[in-house]
A protein has these predicted regions:
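N-terminal presequence-like segments and the immediate start of the first folded domain
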Residues: 1-74, 80-125
Length: 125
């Protein structure tokens, strides 16, 4: 993947972790379904950082099963129950995602009880 920074952007547009445009070459696209997390004991974690980490790990496992990984992700859809937790989510997202950050959108939505975040990842292989 090649990150493209349009001339109008002198710096990252908002300082948030995403790429404004990516150029992608590949033969096959892999998409995860909307993915939330459960803890390893089947419980839903009560804090955003743990939910974010576990959800990204679950997506990563799905991608591996399809023959790719987080480094192949070019777009992430983030669905959050409360955008006031955006910074907590981004802290984990920055730690776990590759240097060439995917394009991204984020929406505040209603989620199933207990869940704070749901992700859909688009990857190329």
């Amino acid at each position: 993947m090649k990150k493209i920074l349009p001339e109008k952007y002198i710096k990252e547009p908002t300082g948030y972790p995403f790429s404004p445009v990516l150029s992608i070459e590949g033969k096959e696209i892999v998409v995860t379904s909307g993915t939330c997390c459960d803890d390893y004991d089947g419980q839903i974690p009560e804090d955003m950082e743990t939910q974010a980490r576990n959800t990204i790990l679950a997506c990563e496992q799905f991608l591996k099963e399809a023959g790719c990984g987080l480094e192949n992700v070019f777009n992430v859809e983030v669905y959050m129950k409360d955008l006031d937790q955006w910074n907590d989510f981004n802290k984990i997202y920055r730690e776990m995602m590759p240097e060439t950050l995917p394009c991204r959108k984020a929406l505040q939505v209603g989620l199933l009880p207990g869940y704070m975040v749901e992700l859909v990842m688009w990857a190329v292989k």
